[in-house]
UniProtKB/Swiss-Prot annotation:
Binding site for K(+): 42
Protein name as annotated: S-adenosylmethionine synthase
Catalytic activity, as annotated: L-methionine + ATP + H2O = S-adenosyl-L-methionine + phosphate + diphosphate
Higher taxonomy: Eukaryota, Viridiplantae, Chlorophyta, Mamiellophyceae, Mamiellales
Record Pfam families: S-AdoMet_synt_C, S-AdoMet_synt_M, S-AdoMet_synt_N
UniProt entry tagged with the keyword Oxidoreductase: no
This protein's GO CC annotations: cytoplasm
Length: 386
């Protein structure tokens, strides 16, 4: 019997996503000059204001205000009409050194080797993969994410000049469960809410969203006469970005990962250097799950890993293939143990996570951290043979 499942996404102009990108833009700037930077950078934004705050220990010389303004411009916040004027808004900076109590426990204030470096905090992280898409990601999440990205493309290339930076998408798909594997049958509902300029008609909005966004993204085989479309259902979305809603780093963790599939340990990614296992642990967990499915060992896989602050080795690892495995989960776990080094410091080395700059981490902060094509940036998307 079929069932419905829904995933949502938000654009890079959503205030929470702007905050994520600013935090990761600052991480990039620090790592580019000093790969051993310790960064825990949060961002908050509201009307005409951006604040960055947290703990950073680095040898890098970074103009934090300049980074904030450049990220705002990159997204498209260039005037009050867009929701934030990145050139003239207030920028508040409250960044201080990492606590020495944390530093001595995690990296010995720089004296520990990579093999000895402990996890930056306690926590449990999950990786997920499914064979329902080429990306080995859930189709609900893939389509919601691609619709949001397409909204940004048509805004920036002029195809739909009435589109402004803020926006949200949501996709509901009818699935069937086939021996633990997820089989998408049809798209049940598509919801798009996009910020727009004053004066554009709802009819024009709906027409362009259908022709220039939905039909360019969603495969025709998933659409039918019964598919439901809600296109800017509120009727008006002129006030957006930080002018419409406050934004804060780390509030879109399900959008960042698997759209509600699998599981989530609760830790956000953006603004955190590789010693923070909230990020690095989740990245290698995705690589494990993806490698399991790519190897044909299972059609769907969930991998969990957990850590204690200051301890290099994980406390536990776990594999669940939802009954879709070709061999027992216990045997898959043994294969994983043979191929992966889960020590906190070694994850950063194997995935090249100390490499910042060129907007590497800023790029991860919008449109999902997983299922991305560029494995030079998204190194955790490389499959490890099992």
């Amino acid at each position: 019997m079929g069932f419905l499942f829904t995933s949502e996404s938000v654009n890079e102009g959503h205030p929470d996503k702007l905050a994520d990108q600013i935090s990761d833009g600052i991480l990039d700037a620090c790592l580019e000059q000093d790969p051993d930077s310790k960064v825990a950078c949060e961002t908050a934004t509201k009307t005409n204001m951006v604040m960055v705050f947290g703990e950073i220990t680095t040898k890098a010389k970074v103009d934090y205000e300049a980074v904030v303004r450049q990220v705002c411009r990159d997204v498209g916040f260039i005037s009050n009409e867009t929701g934030l004027d990145g050139n003239n808004c207030r920028v508040l900076v409250e960044l201080h050194d990492q606590s020495p109590d944390i530093g001595q426990g995690v990296h010995g204030m720089g004296t520990k080797s990579l093999e000895e470096i402990g996890a930056g905090d306690q926590g449990h992280m999950f990786g997920y993969a499914t064979d329902e898409t080429p990306e080995l990601m859930p189709l609900t999440h893939v389509l919601a994410t691609k619709l949001g990205h397409r909204l940004t493309v048509v805004r920036k290339d002029g195809t739909c000049p009435w589109v402004l930076p803020d926006g949200k998408t949501q996709v509901t798909i009818e699935y069937e469960n086939e021996g633990g594997a997820m089989i998408p049958k049809r798209v049940h509902t598509i919801l798009i809410s996009t910020q727009h300029i004053e004066g554009v008609s709802n009819e024009k909005i709906a027409e362009d969203l259908m022709n220039e966004v939905i039909k360019k993204v969603v495969p025709e085989k998933y659409l039918d006469a019964d598919t439901i479309f809600h296109l800017n259902p509120s009727g008006r979305f002129v006030i957006g970005g930080p002018d419409g809603d406050a934004g804060l780093t780390g509030r879109k963790i399900i959008i960042d990962t698997y759209g509600g599939w699998g599981a989530h340990g609760g830790g956000a990614f953006s603004g955190k250097d590789p010693t923070k296992v909230d990020r690095s642990g989740a990245y290698i967990a995705r690589q494990v799950a993806k490698s399991i499915v790519a190897a044909g060992l299972a059609r769907r896989a969930l991998f969990q890993i957990s850590y204690a602050i200051g301890v290099a080795q994980p406390l536990s690892i776990h594999v669940d293939t939802y009954g879709s495995g070709k061999i027992p989960d216990s045997e898959i776990l043994e294969k994983v143990k043979e191929k992966f080094d889960f020590r906190a410091g070694m994850i950063g080395k194997s995935l090249d996570l100390k490499r910042g700059g060129n907007k590497r981490y800023q790029t991860t902060a919008a449109y999902g951290h997983f299922g991305r094509d560029d494995t030079d940036v998204f190194t955790w998307e490389k499959v490890v043979p099992l």
